[in-house]
Amino acid sequence: MAGGEHGVNGQHEETRAMEEGSRDHQARCENSEQDGGSKSSSNNHPMFSVQFAQKVIAEILGTFFLIFAGCAAVAVNKRTGGTVTFPGICITWGLAVMVMVYSVGHISGAHLNPAVTLAFATCGRFPWRRVPAYAAAQVAGSAAASAALRALFGGAPEHFFGTAPAGSDVQSLAMEFIITFYLMFVVSGVATDNRAIGELAGLAVGATVLVNVLFAGPISGASMNPARTIGPAIILGRYTGIWVYIAGPVFGAVAGAWAYNLIRFTDKPLREITMTASFIRSTRRN
């Protein structure tokens, strides 16, 4: 009896040891899988990646060509006694915006404007952690374009291709707010709403810029873009009324984006207003 009881207990102890060993091995495997999964997840979404670097480069190049084309039209018009003409300048700005939207829109979203980037961020359509890099890229592109233009045409005051208030600062501030509101409202409609025809976004945004420059250019210069003003100001050393071209576009863009969001959906609560996108859906995955 005693011998048989010892054999059964020994078998039970061996069984328990095997079960405990199996549980320990399974736990180690699960921990290893979790660690590997977390590492893989962090590698898939790093703070800085090649993909994001490509977006930043696209913003630099897109802003460079936009500012170079638009400001070159202004500089050439002043140097040649008005051969480009004011309507020609307006058309140049509109076409430059349209071309850049179609060129880099599928890569970076073609913000090309710190006010647009900030407005998208406030609506939850662009990650806040990416805003400084985008804004720096846009200002850098504008400054590089301005430096190239200065090298080509010189920096004489009479050939100034930046923006400065033609009237009072308050008048220019109001004008910049309104035209940037208008621009961002259109951008939100044609570039972020699934119901809009996304393929026409570049045409619509470019046409809006053309119209804005046409009627606001003689008043404020129709900047609509802090980078458009800051770049030439840095290179040419002229900062007259620069605060107007930062405050006006920033507040106008944010207001325009939210105004469209308020009318985007009529059958959904406010908390769902900023949950869809079409043309800039790539920026939401950053």
From Swiss-Prot:
- What residue spans carry the Polar residues bias annotation? 34-44
Transmembrane helix recorded as keyword = yes
Kindly report the protein's main subcellular placement as a broad class.
membrane
Q: What's one GO-annotated cellular component?
A: membrane
Q: Where is this motif: NPA 1?
A: 113-115
The yes or no answer to whether the keyword Transmembrane helix is present is: yes
Fetch the CDD domains from UniProt.
Answer: MIP
Gene3D superfamilies registered for this protein in UniProt: Glycerol uptake facilitator protein
Q: Where is this region: Disordered?
A: 1-44
InterPro entries, A to Z = Aquaporin-like (IPR023271), Aquaporin_transptr (IPR034294), MIP (IPR000425), MIP_CS (IPR022357)
Where's it found, cell-wise? Membrane
Source superkingdom = Eukaryota
Instruction: State where composition is biased (Basic and acidic residues).
Output: 11-31
Transmembrane annotation, as ranges: 56-76, 84-104, 131-153, 172-192, 200-220, 239-259
Which terms are listed as keywords in the entry?
Membrane, Repeat, Transmembrane, Transmembrane helix, Transport
Q: Where is the motif (NPA 2)?
A: 225-227
Q: What is known of its domains?
A: Aquaporins contain two tandem repeats each containing three membrane-spanning domains and a pore-forming loop with the signature motif Asn-Pro-Ala (NPA).
NCBIfam families, alphabetized = MIP (TIGR00861)
**What family is this protein classified in?**
Belongs to the MIP/aquaporin (TC 1.A.8) family. NIP (TC 1.A.8.12) subfamily.
Q: What does this protein do?
A: Aquaporins facilitate the transport of water and small neutral solutes across cell membranes.
Please state what the protein is called: Aquaporin NIP1-3
Q: Which organism is it from?
A: Oryza sativa subsp. japonica (Rice)
